[in-house]
């Protein structure tokens, strides 16, 4: 770093400040950190890709001119999103990330996300038990709960907790071999190993570890060879007293076409779920996001967003970034009115996300059956009829193909789905009670 860089940058931002509104300056320029300055190039660090894009598009020339005024020299300005260890006083994180990457062979398994730690996880009633279980496993791998199975909808924090477990273990035991992988990557690596006759290398990669974290395990359902390989991998690790952490969008008993021997093993340890966050947790998540990204958003605005968006954390955070961008691009103060304007398309046009687990849940409540009955082989009318109704609704309200719908209902053939759909369509015309019941179910599914 140039010895005078802090002084040069301080003078430059004072000049920049006179050219911008307070909102724009605080949102885009204030978070910038001066990283290095050589004979030709000034490197500036920003907290995220979004900020980088805005600065490059709108403010790069302004920054260059300000630096030129201070130094009487033309510098090329590079705006980057540095790895976490280069921003601020985080030397320990540098060591941890090196260790996090060391056990990962090639470029196949995933690298732990440095932002996903226990410190950045917002705890609420919807995720408190899952968080506590994750901490327990991180503190005592293979001693507390093995395996740990975390399930929940998209964007609720499963991946965050899995990364946090990996980071915590590595921070306390830098020599630990931690591998984090998606089930899709596991499958692709298996296929490649079979093709290239490298089965031994593949098995060593996933069986000679201390901690194995597998994301989205539901995608191995229906893949016989993958399930076979994962079954033996699971056994090898469990017998060696190594920790296994698994995530899914549903509990083991509701994963269609999952082999029973795997299902039973997933249930050996602890199964915990994450629910959509309540209002207080959503507000806390937004405040944490604003703090992490160094952006200012009034409390009444975060409360407004939290009341309007109830689905998942990703949409909450996306709405926050959209509002801040809208504020900057229109040179307007962040207010509730501005937030409503920025998000009006989301609020007015986005329907509730419909999926099979939600449809099953609502139908099971209306017909008083258990969720597992949808995937069972039971053929009594009290079970088969609600199952047909759920298949009909899935066909009508989602974009899933007939074979995929069959998979979601215990691995049934697509012709079974076609029959169920046709049966309900025909009965609607002659059975007013059924039509009224379906209308009530659909209304509940589409309600906020």
UniProtKB/Swiss-Prot annotation:
It is found in: Cytoplasm. InterPro entries: AAA+_ATPase (IPR003593), Chromosome_initiator_DnaA (IPR001957), Chromosome_initiator_DnaA-like (IPR020591), Chromosome_initiator_DnaA_CS (IPR018312), DnaA_C (IPR013159), DnaA_dom (IPR013317), DnaA_N_dom (IPR024633), DnaA_N_sf (IPR038454). Keywords: ATP-binding, Cytoplasm, DNA replication, DNA-binding, Lipid-binding, Nucleotide-binding. GO terms for molecular function: ATP binding; ATP hydrolysis activity; DNA replication origin binding; lipid binding. ATP binds at residues 155, 157-159. Residues 111-327 are annotated as: Domain III, AAA+ region. Residues 1-85 are annotated as: Domain I, interacts with DnaA modulators. GO terms for cellular component: cytoplasm; plasma membrane. Residues 328-448 are annotated as: Domain IV, binds dsDNA. It comes from the Bacteria. Residues 85-110 are annotated as: Domain II. Disulfide bonds: none annotated. Pfam families: Bac_DnaA (PF00308), Bac_DnaA_C (PF08299), DnaA_N (PF11638). Its main location: cytoplasm. GO terms for biological process: DNA replication initiation; regulation of DNA replication. Domain I is involved in oligomerization and binding regulators, domain II is flexibile and of varying length in different bacteria, domain III forms the AAA+ region, while domain IV binds dsDNA. Plays an essential role in the initiation and regulation of chromosomal replication. ATP-DnaA binds to the origin of replication (oriC) to initiate formation of the DNA replication initiation complex once per cell cycle. Binds the DnaA box (a 9 base pair repeat at the origin) and separates the double-stranded (ds)DNA. Forms a right-handed helical filament on oriC DNA; dsDNA binds to the exterior of the filament while single-stranded (ss)DNA is stabiized in the filament's interior. Belongs to the DnaA family. Oligomerizes as a right-handed, spiral filament on DNA at oriC. This is Chromosomal replication initiator protein DnaA. It comes from Alkaliphilus metalliredigens (strain QYMF).
């Amino acid at each position: 770093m140039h010895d005078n860089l802090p002084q040069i940058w301080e003078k430059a931002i004072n000049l920049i400040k006179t050219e911008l509104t307070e909102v724009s300056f605080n949102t885009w320029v204030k978070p910038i950190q001066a990283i290095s300055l050589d004979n030709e190039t000034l490197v500036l660090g920003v907290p995220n890709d979004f900020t980088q894009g805005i600065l490059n598009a709108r403010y790069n020339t302004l920054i260059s001119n300000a630096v030129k005024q201070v130094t009487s020299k033309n510098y090329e300005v590079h705006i980057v999103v540095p790895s976490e260890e280069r921003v601020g006083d985080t030397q320990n994180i540098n060591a941890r990330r090196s260790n996090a990457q060391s056990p990962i062979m090639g470029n196949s398994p995933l690298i732990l996300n440095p932002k996903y730690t226990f410190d950045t996880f917002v705890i609420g009633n919807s995720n408190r038990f899952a968080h506590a279980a994750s901490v327990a496993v991180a503190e005592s791998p293979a001693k507390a709960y093995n395996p740990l199975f975390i399930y929940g909808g998209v964007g609720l924090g499963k991946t965050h907790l899995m990364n946090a477990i990996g980071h915590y273990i590595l921070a306390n035991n830098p020599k630990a071999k931690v591998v984090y992988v998606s089930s899709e990557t596991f499958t692709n690596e298996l296929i490649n190993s079979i093709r290239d006759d490298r089965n031994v290398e593949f098995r060593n990669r996933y069986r000679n570890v201390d901690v194995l974290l597998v994301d989205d395990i539901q995608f191995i359902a229906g893949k016989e060879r993958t399930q076979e390989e994962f079954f033996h991998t699971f056994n090898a690790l469990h017998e060696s007293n190594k920790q296994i952490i698994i995530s899914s969008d549903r509990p083991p008993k509701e994963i269609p076409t999952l082999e029973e021997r795997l299902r039973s093993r997933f249930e050996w340890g602890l199964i915990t779920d994450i629910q959509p966050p309540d209002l207080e947790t959503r507000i806390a998540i937004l405040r944490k996001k604003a703090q992490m990204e160094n952006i200012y958003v009034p409390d009444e605005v975060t409360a407004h967003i939290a009341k309007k968006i109830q689905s998942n954390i990703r949409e909450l955070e996306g709405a926050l970034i959209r509002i801040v961008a809208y504020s900057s691009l229109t040179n307007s103060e962040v207010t509730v009115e501005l937030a409503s304007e920025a998000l009006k398309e989301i609020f007015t046009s986005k329907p509730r996300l419909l999926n099979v687990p939600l449809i099953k849940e609502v139908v099971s409540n209306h017909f008083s059956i258990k969720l597992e009955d949808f995937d069972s082989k039971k053929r009594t009318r009290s079970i088969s009829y609600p199952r047909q109704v759920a298949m009909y609704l899935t066909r009508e309200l989602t974009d899933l193909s007939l074979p995929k719908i069959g998979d979601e209902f215990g691995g049934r053939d697509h012709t079974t789905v076609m029959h169920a759909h046709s049966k309900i369509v025909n009965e609607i015309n002659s059975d007013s009670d059924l039509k009224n019941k379906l209308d009530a179910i659909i209304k509940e599914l589409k309600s906020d």
